[in-house]
Amino acid sequence: AKLLATPEASLPRRLAKVTVAFEARGAVAVEAYAVSSCVGGGAARAMACAPEHAGHKFVPFGCVAARLGAPGGGRCYTFLPVPVRTGLPVDVNGYFELSSNRRDVWHGEDMAGAGRLKSEWNVALLKDVVAVAYARLLLALGAAAAGLWPLEAGAGPCWDACRAAVFDEARDLPLLTTDLDGGRAIEPKRCVAARAEDGAIADLLLLERLPVVALEPALHAALVASKCVGAECSPKFVRAFYI
């Protein structure tokens, strides 16, 4: 199949700004969204192309959308809205397998047969497709993406898996900024993550030409917990560096 033969790095990806105008209470309201969409690889592509899964019509395509200039997100769509909260600060759309009442994304680890397959598909779609689109959206928005990192955990197994996969994807992308060399973008895996209040220590390490990145507490905690950063600016790290 052409999909299987395409190198993963060459699979279709698209970024777009979408403006929506609608009438509300006699006035025209305008909302703008940044939208990232892609066809994914990994387990999602393998499942979609497996002959034994042909009847399920799995499609490894998904997208995420972030409203620009206003808070939003947390909604899930399978082209039509699904009444489930994802805990993510972006909206998510994909070819998900839904529960029988179409009110939730199918999930569960204690299933067998078709139910287990549906659950595995949803996780693969979130990890190999949605998370890739999400990380690329963060990269495209640059500084404007500060409030779009997936910091909230506990929305459910599927969404926690997606959240973890976003940090995995983010590790290798220049999403953070260090003051080293006058300021430049850097991949999380190469940085020393400091809290905003670590000013004096961070400045000292910058003088030693370490790529220190100052982060807000919630993002710092999430990046460190996900093992996304190269090192954490801590007394232990500083002692080890100078000894």
Spell out what each predicted region is.
Residues A1-I243:
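GHKL/Bergerat-fold ATPase module
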